[in-house]
Amino acid sequence: MLKLHPSIDNGFPPASPGFAGGTLKCKCASNPVTVRIGSQTAHNHACGCTKCWKPEGAIFAQIAVVGRDNVNVTSGAEKLQVVDPSATIQRYACRDCGTHMYGRIENTKHPFYGLDFVHTELSDETGWSPPEFAAFVSSIIESGVNPESMPEIRARLTELGLQPYDCLSPPLMDAIATHIAKQTGALPA
């Protein structure tokens, strides 16, 4: 069987009704960074971009969003560093193990400002929103995946119920376009 990501390869459970979040933990055996997520996540997806953190051997990352006011570093804050200060999403990673703990957009004019990006697979709790789609699928080629494998990869994503896109899902692309249209005056604010 084609391996995409350990949290999606064998299917995934549905979200638990009333699930209110949990704690993410980096891969350090001692003194791990922990981040409390205070609510359910949304727009969970497999991501093929080369910026997102992936566990060892994974082709895709698994990433979801949550309101930034629901993200709280509870231990190890001194170990966090921004991976690429020039990136739109400031990805905070543990400097010891390299695990990305959360990503934050600081540009208040960005359509996704106020949402943080998190890897729910770093939590021991169950009940998180499941992945809904696969984004930036073609980008896995940039990380070394053979382009000839793409039809098989897209077929496997589809088999898992994850519609493959080479951008974000249509509702997220609509949200971006709506935000821009309101900023430019093409739509009322």
Curated annotation (Swiss-Prot):
Database matches in InterPro entries:
CENP-V/GFA, Formald_GSH, Mss4-like_sf
Biological role? Catalyzes the condensation of formaldehyde and glutathione to S-hydroxymethylglutathione.
Q: What SUPFAM superfamilies is this protein classified in?
A: Mss4-like (SSF51316)
Q: Where is the CENP-V/GFA domain?
A: 19-166
Reaction(s) catalysed (UniProt annotation):
S-(hydroxymethyl)glutathione = glutathione + formaldehyde
Per UniProt, the keywords (alphabetical) are: Lyase, Metal-binding, Plasmid, Zinc
Q: Which family does it belong to?
A: Belongs to the Gfa family.
The enzyme's E.C. designation: 4.4.1.22
Q: Which Gene3D superfamilies match?
A: glutathione-dependent formaldehyde- activating enzyme (gfa)
* Coiled-coil segments on the chain, per record: none
The entry's protein name is Glutathione-dependent formaldehyde-activating enzyme
In which pathway is this protein known to take part?
One-carbon metabolism; formaldehyde degradation; formate from formaldehyde (glutathione route): step 1/3
What is the main EC category here? lyase
Q: Which HAMAP family match?
A: Formald_GSH (MF_00723)
Q: Tell me which PROSITE patterns the record gives.
A: CENP_V_GFA
**UniProt key word Metal-binding:** yes
Details of cofactor binding: Binds 2 Zn(2+) ions per subunit.
Q: Where does Zn(2+) 2 bind?
A: 47, 49, 52
